[in-house]
Regions:
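Transmembrane beta-strands of outer-membrane beta-barrel pores
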Residues: 1, 40-44, 53-59, 94-98, ...
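Outer-membrane beta-barrel translocator domains and adjoining extracellular loop/strand segments
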Residues: 2-9, 59-66, 101-108, 168-177
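Surface-exposed loop/turn segments flanking beta-strands in extracellular/periplasmic regions
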Residues: 4-19, 109-127
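Extracellular loop and loop/strand-boundary signature of outer-membrane beta-barrel proteins
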Residues: 18-24, 59-65, 129-134, 171-181
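Residues that define the transmembrane beta-barrel architecture of outer-membrane proteins
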Residues: 28-34, 64-73, 137-143, 183-189
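Residues on the lipid-exposed face of transmembrane beta-strands in outer-membrane beta-barrel proteins
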Residues: 34-40, 75-81, 143-151, 189-197
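Outer-envelope beta-barrel architecture signal
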Residues: 43-49, 84-90, 152-158, 197
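Transmembrane beta-strands of outer-membrane beta-barrel proteins
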Residues: 48-54, 89-95, 146, 157-165, ...
């Protein structure tokens, strides 16, 4: 993401609660993903499942040597049915997220402080300086509902979704002390009318 003052991976996910320093530097990234799913028809009902997984490793080869490992797992299940010339669906999502990150210094000149950022340019003074490792974890979930007219028919189409994920930042060097929690809530909705063709 080329973001200064950041020694954590997934900046867009955990911002503003990142580990940071004044030097920064170039990073290397490895990312592995897989995704799979299936759908089964049972009479008028359709049941679908999907699983996505992402593993990421980010590191620097010069001081400060940040290293972050991310695992991100999402499981979805949904059920759908055709009723009154419309297709209706209801789904649910479970999300599991973990990131471990740390910064090491190997040069003889010594270390610089690492800052536990709090947003708007502020940092957590009590836990900054020598606490150069943290991990993030989250268990979230969501649900969505939708409907649309059958093929060749007109009518109302709609969708709505809600997702909630609380990300905790935990200092492993202080007996797994949680120092921040980021609550991410997303609402989405769409409403429309399909003209019959």
């Amino acid at each position: 993401d080329n973001v200064k003052w950041n020694a954590s991976a997934d900046w867009r996910t955990i911002y503003p609660y990142v580990l940071a320093d004044t030097l920064g530097g170039d990073r290397n990234t490895e990312r592995y993903t897989f995704q799979g799913g299936c759908a089964t028809r049972l009479g008028h009902w359709t049941i679908g499942e999907e699983l996505t997984f992402r593993a990421e490793h980010e590191w620097a080869t010069h001081d400060p040597r940040m290293r972050a490992i991310v695992t991100d797992l999402n499981a979805r299940i949904g059920v759908g049915r055709t009723l009154l010339h419309h297709h209706f669906a209801l789904g649910g999502t479970l999300s599991l997220y973990k990131q471990t990150n740390s910064v090491e210094f190997y040069r003889e000149e010594g270390k610089i402080p690492e800052y536990q950022m709090m947003g708007l340019g502020n940092w957590y003074e009590r836990f900054s300086g020598t606490n150069n490792s943290a991990y993030y974890k989250a268990v979230g979930g969501g649900m969505d509902v939708g409907g649309r007219p059958s093929a060749g028919r007109g009518g109302l189409l709609f969708s709505a979704s809600y997702n909630y994920t609380p990300y905790k930042r935990i200092l492993s060097s202080l007996n797994a002390l949680p120092i921040t929690q980021l609550y991410v809530t997303q609402w989405q909705g769409r409403l429309g009318w399909k003209v019959r063709m």
